[in-house]
């Protein structure tokens, strides 16, 4: 399983209405426009995670256990296959992000989450960093469970960057002006509608130009954000 490509695992989970909550990222699209076909072992070794990280943590926060071999040839086992209280050292957090220097992974057990029923993304247009920063602070402290947020600055001197960004908005049939903040709300439709209503008041969105990406627009947008195609 540690050699299994992450895209294959995501496909299997999707067929069962589940997902990896930490949102795997794929740097291959940024470099050559196609997947780098990373393995689950590679993701754990590098501890890479996508846009939900500030809410659900990184890969290391979703490892239940692992088996591996250290530099002396000793077999190492840590954790288990279920979520429960345990004692001793949490080696899973130690090996995550160690880039394979501590142990060669042979088996990994990860937590998975129910797949979110739907999502929307709110785009807030502004070139004023102070205002954007204040919005970020409010989003982070909000009880309305924003699952992702990012700031995309305008870069007029970087034509490829602006071209990629404009393609996203052309696909979404939206006008694009300057820099913008994007944040995502996930869950069932009723919950999304209620939280959006509260966030509009909480963030004073009436003072900003804004637009909304529906679920079919939001999913590819965050794929490109997670894969660093918009940066």
Task: Give the location of each predicted region.
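C-terminal substrate-binding/cap subdomain adjacent to the FAD-binding core in PCMH-type
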Residues: 45, 64-230
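FAD-binding glycine-rich core of flavoenzymes that anchor FAD
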Residues: 3-93
């Amino acid at each position: 399983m540690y050699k299994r490509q992450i895209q294959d695992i995501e496909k299997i989970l999707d067929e069962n209405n589940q997902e990896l909550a930490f949102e795997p990222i794929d740097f291959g699209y940024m470099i050559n426009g196609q997947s780098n076909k990373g393995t689950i072992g590679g993701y754990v070794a590098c501890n890479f995670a996508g846009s939900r990280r500030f809410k659900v943590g990184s890969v290391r926060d979703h490892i239940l256990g692992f088996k591996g071999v250290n530099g002396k040839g000793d077999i190492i086992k840590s954790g288990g296959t279920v979520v429960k209280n345990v004692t001793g050292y949490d080696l899973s957090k130690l090996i995550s992000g160690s880039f394979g220097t501590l142990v060669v992974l042979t088996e990994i057990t990860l937590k998975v989450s129910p797949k979110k029923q739907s999502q929307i993304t709110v785009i807030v247009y502004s070139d004023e960093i102070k205002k954007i920063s204040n919005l970020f602070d409010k989003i982070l402290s909000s009880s309305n469970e924003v699952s992702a947020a990012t700031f995309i600055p305008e870069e007029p001197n970087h034509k490829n960057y602006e071209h990629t960004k404009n393609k996203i908005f052309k696909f979404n049939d939206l006008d694009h002006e300057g820099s913008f903040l994007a944040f995502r709300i996930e869950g069932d439709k009723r919950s999304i509608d209620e939280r959006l209503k509260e966030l509009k008041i909480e963030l004073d969105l009436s003072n900003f130009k804004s637009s909304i990406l529906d679920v079919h627009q939001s999913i590819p947008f965050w794929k490109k954000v997670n894969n660093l195609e918009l940066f």
